[in-house]
């Protein structure tokens, strides 16, 4: 195996630093990483309500981690699960949960929007396009990691 390229080392460093910055933001907001991600997804849904499946998918967290964090949020009176149909569940924020999300995660989203808003539109589009290309290629190639 050849060594890791300089570009890949830089990429991994930046990814790690971004993760660390979001962890620091969660701490500054008084939230766990998983609670922040769940609240973030629920803020993005617009109604502070979203399917459990979508929360798992959009948060990047495992179902087990989401369920564990939701139990904690439920215990604190911030969220509840509502059955939908025969199998589905929606994650809903209580009034207290909505107030928490508006006072924490909504502020984080405003920071992110301000950063992207300060970039030229073509830079934002290029950044997002390259990130999507990387994600698509990585998913495709990762499918074959088990095959030798």
Where are these regions (language model features)?
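C-terminal regulatory/oligomerization modules of transcriptional regulators
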Residues: 1, 122-148
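N-terminal leader segment of winged-helix/HTH proteins
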Residues: 1-29, 76
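Hydrophobic alpha-helical segments typical of transmembrane helices
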Residues: 10, 22, 51, 111-112
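N-terminal helix-turn-helix DNA-binding core of bacterial DNA-binding proteins
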Residues: 20-65
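Charged, amphipathic alpha-helical coiled-coil/dimerization segments
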Residues: 71-128
């Amino acid at each position: 195996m050849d060594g890791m390229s300089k570009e890949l080392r830089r990429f991994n460093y930046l990814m790690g630093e971004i993760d660390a910055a979001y962890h620091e933001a969660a701490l500054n907001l008084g939230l766990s990483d998983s609670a922040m991600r769940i609240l973030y997804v629920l803020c993005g849904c617009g109604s502070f309500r979203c399917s459990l499946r979508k929360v798992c998918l959009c948060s990047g967290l495992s179902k087990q981690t989401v369920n564990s964090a939701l139990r904690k949020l439920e215990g604190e009176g911030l969220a509840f699960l509502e059955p939908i149909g025969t199998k589905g569940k929606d994650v809903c924020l209580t009034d207290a949960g909505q107030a928490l999300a508006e006072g924490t995660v909504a502020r984080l989203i405003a920071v992110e929007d301000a950063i992207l808003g300060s970039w030229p539109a073509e830079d934002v589009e290029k950044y997002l396009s390259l990130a999507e290309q990387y994600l698509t290629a990585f998913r495709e190639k990762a499918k074959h990691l088990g095959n030798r």
